[in-house]
Amino acid sequence: GKSSILKALYSEKKIICGEAKIGQTDLKQLKENEIPFLRRKIGIIFQDFKLLKDRNVFKNLEFVLKATGWNDSKIRKEKIESCLKKVHILDLINKFPNQLSGGQKQKVAIARALLNDPEIILADEPTGNLDPISSIEVMNVLREINESGNTILMATHDFSLLEKFKGRIIVCRNGEISEMDYDKLKIEKVYA
């Protein structure tokens, strides 16, 4: 259910009933030719990093900017360096994916999600393939991004992340979505 909701918000899955909006965009009324424009407003982070193996970090990020219409190479370079600074890996700009740890790859994926100054960031199990230390590093970066004003909607099954990085919690249960208080969720987890 968690990943399906994120896919619906990203317009990878069609919304059949109910209502969903990103900003002023009604996802149920969205036309096929409007999807690329919507996706420029959304940053997405998957648990599998999906980096291009034959390109270094700079070229991986530049590929996204070129694909979304950024034609000025000077502006692309500035945006890439700015996003890499935000996730604390500017020093890895010339490294290839096979030279990066899992946590570093995920930070590249987060930088990629920030490139187009998204209105919202969708993070689908962003620490799912990481060791505990890398998970904490990635979550700290996401917290910094959130505290700087970006909205992040994260799907996770990792209860320990909810304990360490508290925020608003939305629970998917039996096809229903509801907001839940952390303490109530903790009690339900204990007695489940």
Regions found by a protein language model. Give the residues of each.
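Catalytic Walker B motif of ABC-type/P-loop ATPase nucleotide-binding domains
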Residues: I121-D124
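Helix-to-loop junction immediately C-terminal to a conserved catalytic motif
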Residues: Y10
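Conserved ABC transporter NBD signature motif
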Residues: G18-D26
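Conserved ABC ATPase signature
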Residues: F96-L100, Q104-Q106
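Conserved ABC ATPase "signature" region
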Residues: T25-D26, E62, K66-G69, S73-L92
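A short, proline-enriched helix->beta-strand linker immediately N-terminal to the Walker B motif
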Residues: L115-E119
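Helix N-cap at the start of a conserved alpha-helix in ABC-type nucleotide-binding domains
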Residues: P132-S134
